[in-house]
């Protein structure tokens, strides 16, 4: 490890020396943000986009390094560098620093080699243009230069970490596949399935990398624009582009798929960079960016559809049971586990400057990818169902008491605000008026001691504290979910404790109220009976007009019948009727029995929740039994003493008591005889009215029971309808996601077909150009050979001289014919 670290320190110092940067490092951890920013600016000749000039903390430095990595990945390499993050480099991770140094080293070597290769090519072309004669040689030179710049314009867009196209001797399909390709999307998806081979590939790549190793000579990418502007013809020579029918398809291949690559680790700026332009767009940008004032960074924003595709396809795998935030168009920062996964998921064939050819995405990988996405969608649906199930349990707990129900209601509304569109969809139902929510306990006259309840409350608080302390040690996202669950449990326990105390007190108050209402009903009946006795004793006439007016008013106004007020309401509606005490008592008992039966039916669902209350009642009952035993023994001793005293007093007053007894017996006998006679007399008159009243009371009980059953059935139907509606919403959501995934698969297959068509077309074009060049070269070679063979023949030269002399003679005779008799030649 020490020797390898020393080698990397040497590589870093050599890079700094070659770039004329006055910095020297002694350890690998000394390569901080300033070193990589200086390397970027000196090698590429541009400013780092989104650079924070004066970083104040470690996050700003991580942001600067991340900007360097993203600029390399998007603008130059066009490959995913998610295994290198700015945060790891600022922290001093040796693996990330070595990877980034290797990228800069290979980039610098490639650019220097390209410059050195382009300079002799330029001198050769100049010499060839000087020696060539005629128009054909000039046209050939122009064609070769145009072909070079066409290749250069294509190769700018395909600058990646793989082998960037073979030479002319290799297969033409492979070269066109390297020039025009789908991008890194398919490889980014397939990198996750290659986790088992990642560590071995990284080790082999490190072993093969060394300071003296040069980049492969077959790379045809011309590098950054600053170096290209010095070496070739001017930018006007590059104005010729591929046919216009190919440019829209290339743009379609470049832009949307580039937006789907997750190249946004932490500290990445919110504004994404533009995808790599192809064709005329890149030539236009090279014409203006190659000027000396081209240091600024142009970053048009990505369309909202692309951003939404990014946010929906690349979510965190370690997501908790809560739904994501509503702003789906913003790009999420991956978690630490995802960064580690991406760092380990880059095989050797996708690393920078590797010599392996990239393979297209197969159907099996697409199928596995769609299965992963569907599995993630089912997990999200399951999380939503579990969240809604927790809410349902909170609603059942909220119906235990009045005060506690309000707390649970508020807690359910808070939870529903996170999972549902409105609180009214799944909000707690109001309790029906005919039901009591607490079990009836035996009547006690003394106050309850809350010692056991306080102990239980303390135990619950201690458990909650321990649970909270454990939750704070976990991750931040898990802590948030645990605190919310803890708050729900706290509200549940508070409601149970309040119900435990309040239920017993309410039972006592309820018994007192029922006793009071019974005592109020019975005296009313007796007073009315006495009034009726007076009216019947005076005259047996029809009821007074007041009673008629009362009946009319009661018919006009709507009736409100509670669970205890049916009998009292009927007595108020029929004040002139006489009801005997046994019948009245029997009716009251029937009503109480029906109320108790309804209470028992309502409390069957809550028996499991009142287990703690039963234990408290059992302890209190034992306490009452012990107290009763002590009191009974004390009363027994006191009774014995009183009995002895009473015997002594009875012997003195026996005669007086005997006389008073005889008098009371005689008076009682007289009163009973009178009462029996009067009752027999009145029963004959009131039997019919009593039967009518009894029948009406039974019908009222049946109406009340039927009404409660209808209300219960209505509530059950509403709940079933809400469940059905919720299930329909879940099904529609699932169908929507399935449709989206099917559309995505169709788009990918269509783009692959278009890519194959373009590759085939370019292969045909290359074959045609090669055939034309070969035919032309063969023709020129044949002419040269023919000329060489003729130059060796002396007769050929003599014939040439003869023909030239003949031509001169013809010209001379033609001139002589114009002036046939010159003066100077007559003699």
Curated annotation (Swiss-Prot):
Keywords: Coiled coil, Cytoplasm, Cytoskeleton, Phosphoprotein
Cell compartments where the protein resides: Cytoplasm, Cytoskeleton, Microtubule organizing center, Centrosome; Cytoplasm, Cytoskeleton, Spindle pole
Keyword Cytoplasm part of the UniProt annotation: yes
Phosphoprotein is among the record's keywords: yes
Biased composition (Polar residues): 187-199
Coiled coil: 584-633, 701-795
InterPro entries, A to Z: CEP95, CH_dom_sf, DUF5745
Primary residence: cytoplasm
Residues bearing the modification Phosphoserine: 447, 449, 451
GO cellular component terms, semicolon-separated: centrosome; cytoplasm; spindle pole
Region (Disordered) location: 115-145, 183-249, 308-372, 388-476, 489-558
Basic and acidic residues: compositionally biased ranges: 123-145, 327-343, 360-372
Descriptive protein name: Centrosomal protein of 95 kDa
Source organism: Mus musculus (Mouse)
Lineage: Eukaryota, Metazoa, Chordata, Craniata, Vertebrata
């Amino acid at each position: 490890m020490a020797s390898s670290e020393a080698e990397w320190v040497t590589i870093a110092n050599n890079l700094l020396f070659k770039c004329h940067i006055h910095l020297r490092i002694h350890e690998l951890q000394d390569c901080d943000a300033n070193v990589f920013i200086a390397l970027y600016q000196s090698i590429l000749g541009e400013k780092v986009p989104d650079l924070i000039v004066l970083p104040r903390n470690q996050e700003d430095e991580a942001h600067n390094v991340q900007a360097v990595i993203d600029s390399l990945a998007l603008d130059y390499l066009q490959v995913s560098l998610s295994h290198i993050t700015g945060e790891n480099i600022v922290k001093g991770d040796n693996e990330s620093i070595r990877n980034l140094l290797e990228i800069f080293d290979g980039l610098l070597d490639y650019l220097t080699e390209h410059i050195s290769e382009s300079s002799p090519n330029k001198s050769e072309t100049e010499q060839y243009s000087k020696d060539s004669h005629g128009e054909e040689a000039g046209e050939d030179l122009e064609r070769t230069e145009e072909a070079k710049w066409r290749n250069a314009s294509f190769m700018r867009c395909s600058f990646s970490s793989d082998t960037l196209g073979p030479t002319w001797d290799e297969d033409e399909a492979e070269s066109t596949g390297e020039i025009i390709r789908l991008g890194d999307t398919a490889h980014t998806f397939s990198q996750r399935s290659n986790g088992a081979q990642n560590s071995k590939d990284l080790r082999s790549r490190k072993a093969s990398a060394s300071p003296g190793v040069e980049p492969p000579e077959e790379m045809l990418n011309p590098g950054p624009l600053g170096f290209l502007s010095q070496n070739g013809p001017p930018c006007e020579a590059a104005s010729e582009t591929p046919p216009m029918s190919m440019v829209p398809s290339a743009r379609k291949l470049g832009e949307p798929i580039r937006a789907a690559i997750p190249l946004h680790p932490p500290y990445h700026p919110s504004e994404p960079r533009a995808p790599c332009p192809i064709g005329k767009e890149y030539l236009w940008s090279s014409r203006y960016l190659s000027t000396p004032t081209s240091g600024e960074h142009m970053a048009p924003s990505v369309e909202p559809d692309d951003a939404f595709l990014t946010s929906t396809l690349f979510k965190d795998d370690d997501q908790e049971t809560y739904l994501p935030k509503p702003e789906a168009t913003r790009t999420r920062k991956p978690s630490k586990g995802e960064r580690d996964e991406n760092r380990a998921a880059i095989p050797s064939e996708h690393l920078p400057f590797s010599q392996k050819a990239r393979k297209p995405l197969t159907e099996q990988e697409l199928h596995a990818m769609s299965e992963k996405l569907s599995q993630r969608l089912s997990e999200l649906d399951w999380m939503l169902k579990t969240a809604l199930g927790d809410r349902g349990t909170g609603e059942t707990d909220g119906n235990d008491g009045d005060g506690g129900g309000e707390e649970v209601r508020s807690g359910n509304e808070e939870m529903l605000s996170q999972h549902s569109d409105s609180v009214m969809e799944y909000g707690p139902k109001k309790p029906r008026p005919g039901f009591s929510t607490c079990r009836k306990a035996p009547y006690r006259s003394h106050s309850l001691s809350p010692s056991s309840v306080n102990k239980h409350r303390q135990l619950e608080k201690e458990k909650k504290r321990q649970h909270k302390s454990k939750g704070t040690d976990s991750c931040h996202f898990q802590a948030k979910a645990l605190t919310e669950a803890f708050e729900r449990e706290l509200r549940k326990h508070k409601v149970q404790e309040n119900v435990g105390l309040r239920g017993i007190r309410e039972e006592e108050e309820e018994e007192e109220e029922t006793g009071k209402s019974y005592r109020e009903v019975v005296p009313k009946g007796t007073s009315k009976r006495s009034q009726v006795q007076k009216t019947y004793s005076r005259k047996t006439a029809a009821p007074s007009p007041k009673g008629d007016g009362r009946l009319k008013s009661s018919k006009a106004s709507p009736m409100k019948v509670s669970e205890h007020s049916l009998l009292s309401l009927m007595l108020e509606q029929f004040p002139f009727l006489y009801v005997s005490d046994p019948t009245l008592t029997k009716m009251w008992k029937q009503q109480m029995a029906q109320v108790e039966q309804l209470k028992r039916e309502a409390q069957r669902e809550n028996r499991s929740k009142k287990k703690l209350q039963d234990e408290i009642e059992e302890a209190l009952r034992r306490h009452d039994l012990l107290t009763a035993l002590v009191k009974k023994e004390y009363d027994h001793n006191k009774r014995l003493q009183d009995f002895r005293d009473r015997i002594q007093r009875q012997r003195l007053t026996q005669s007086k008591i005997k006389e008073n007894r005889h008098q009371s017996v005689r008076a009682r006998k007289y009163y009973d005889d009178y009462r029996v006679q009067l009752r027999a007399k009145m029963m004959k008159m009131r039997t019919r009215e009593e039967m009518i009243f009894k029948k009406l009371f039974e019908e009222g009980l049946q109406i009340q029971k039927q009404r409660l059953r209808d209300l219960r059935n209505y509530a059950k139907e509403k709940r079933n309808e809400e469940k059905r509606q919720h299930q329909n919403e879940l099904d529609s959501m699932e169908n929507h996601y399935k449709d989206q995934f099917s559309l995505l698969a169709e788009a990918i297959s269509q783009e692959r077909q278009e890519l194959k068509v373009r590759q085939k077309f370019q292969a045909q074009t290359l074959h045609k150009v090669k055939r034309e060049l070969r035919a032309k070269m063969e023709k020129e070679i044949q002419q040269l050979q023919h000329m060489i063979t003729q130059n060796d023949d002396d007769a050929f030269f003599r014939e040439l001289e003869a023909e030239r002399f003949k031509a001169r003679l013809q010209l001379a005779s033609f001139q002589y014919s114009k002036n046939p008799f010159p003066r100077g030649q007559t003699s």
